[in-house]
Amino acid sequence: MERPEHELIRQSWRAVSRSPLEHGTVLFARLFDLEPDLLPLFQYNCRQFSSPEDCLSSPEFLDHIRKVMLVIDAAVTNVEDLSSLEEYLAGLGRKHRAVGVKLSSFSAVGESLLYMLEKCLGPTFTPATRAAWSQLYGAVVQAMSRGWNGE
């Protein structure tokens, strides 16, 4: 990824980061539409959610959304040197495997991320911006996959 892509990512993230919980909720609502089988993986205090809406409104899950948005923020901040996040992201991959997330679900998360960005940014979400974010997410997933695979 080159400097122009880095700037597209940073510029677009500024708009999203003003309301991370709102936009993170859009991301996860889309994820549950794409992969409803992920919903049972989210349990807090032995509570099983009856619907995506039930999950998306729970304080515990809202905290999870905040954490995910912080990880995205860290990737944006370190876009020029993602290797600095390598160990952290590998650890996230291990954690996701431990709770039953399939490696293939990372693809649906990527689709959901792009969907959220498109909804948030509207016409400023250009093909070049989409491509830059796809590259960034691909690098994040590559690091998480290493952890998921036990590397």
Curated annotation (Swiss-Prot):
One of its GO terms (biological process) is oxygen transport. Its EC number is 1.7.-.-. Heme b binds at residues 64, 96. Phosphorylated during hypoxia by ERK1/ERK2. Phosphorylation regulates the heme pocket hexacoordination preventing the association of His-64 with the heme metal center. Thereby, promotes the access of dioxygen and nitrite to the heme and stimulates the nitrite reductase activity. Phosphorylation during hypoxia is stabilized by 14-3-3 proteins. InterPro entries: Globin, Globin-like_OT, Globin-like_sf, Globin/Proto. GO terms for molecular function: GDP-dissociation inhibitor activity; heme binding; metal ion binding; nitrite reductase activity; oxygen binding; oxygen carrier activity. Keywords: Cytoplasm, Disulfide bond, Heme, Iron, Metal-binding, Mitochondrion, Oxidoreductase. It catalyses: Fe(III)-heme b-[protein] + nitric oxide + H2O = Fe(II)-heme b-[protein] + nitrite + 2 H(+). Residues 1-149 form the Globin domain. It is found in: Cytoplasm, Cytosol; Mitochondrion matrix. One of its GO terms (cellular component) is cytosol. Monomeric globin with a bis-histidyl six-coordinate heme-iron atom through which it can bind dioxygen, carbon monoxide and nitric oxide. Could help transport oxygen and increase its availability to the metabolically active neuronal tissues, though its low quantity in tissues as well as its high affinity for dioxygen, which may limit its oxygen-releasing ability, argue against it. The ferrous/deoxygenated form exhibits a nitrite reductase activity and it could produce nitric oxide which in turn inhibits cellular respiration in response to hypoxia. Belongs to the globin family. Monomer. Homodimer and homotetramer; disulfide-linked. Mainly monomeric but also detected as part of homodimers and homotetramers. Interacts with 14-3-3 proteins; regulates the phosphorylation of NGB. Could interact (ferrous form) with G-alpha(i) proteins (GTP-bound form). This is Neuroglobin. It comes from Sus scrofa. The lineage of its organism: Eukaryota, Metazoa, Chordata, Craniata, Vertebrata. The gene is NGB.
